[in-house]
Amino acid sequence: NNETTIPVISLSMPYENWFGEEEGFYNKIREEISHRVHVEYFDSTYNEYFYVNSKVKLGGNWSLGYPQRTLNLNFNKDENGNKNEKVKAHVFGERMMLGNSNQRLTDLTRFRLHNGGNCFEERTGFNDAILQNLMYGTNASTTAYRPCIAYLNGEYWGLYSIREHYSDTYFEDNYGVDKDNVALYELKGKITFDDGNDFESKEFMKRIDNFLKNDFSNDQIYQSFIDKVLIEPENAKHKMII
């Protein structure tokens, strides 16, 4: 019965999955551990509500050791591996699709509850979200953000950020690209495959490695890289400048 001006998300699963000695998120800091969690969402007016059973994994790097853990929620499939219908909700308010400025971002299959990352210790918790919002409208892909209140098994767990998660479905939700045609790579010391369809990763990495051995001050080599790897120069410029 408490009033709130921001959305509320409630997460429920067995106590052992949160705090157990074997696979509890608050005892074992391992990204590969996953559980099933019941998620309930209420907007600030209580006019919009949904619930879904979701896969949940820990996210983050250094921030994995903080009292609030980043939680990656994926409800694309049920516990039997069957595909779920997308959740239709205005979780990100008035945010529009990046690939279609006339359509609001409403169809969801995953998002993350973000603890603020590296700025958690400074007690701000929204530095990254502010940067993403400043980037919105440029040619760089950004993730939507909305603050929320979180409850774990009915216990108040503080302020979190609801964030889009870079994934195969992110590009499907924002740009209309079939997720089966998406391969997402991540740079953590080295480039590794992260999500999507790994059908051409070895060939892709081979092409990248070969190109990076060249001298890009040569106009012909630079243009060949743009044409063959299909990088859009304006997008790359915006990303690097920001």
Report the location of each language-model feature.
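Short, glycine/acidic-rich beta->alpha junctions
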Residues: E31, F126-N127, A140-A144, P233-K237
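Carboxylate/His-rich catalytic cores and anion/metal-binding grooves
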Residues: S34-R36, E40-N100, A144-D195
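Regulatory N- and C-terminal appendages and interdomain linkers associated
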Residues: N1-G59
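Loop/turn elements at helix/coil->beta-strand transitions in domains of secreted/extracellular proteins
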Residues: T5-I6, L108-T109, N139-T143, E155, ...
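A conserved alpha-helical element in kinase catalytic cores
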Residues: F120-A140
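Extracytoplasmic low-complexity repetitive segments enriched in small/polar residues
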Residues: N2-T5, P67, N82, T106-T109, ...
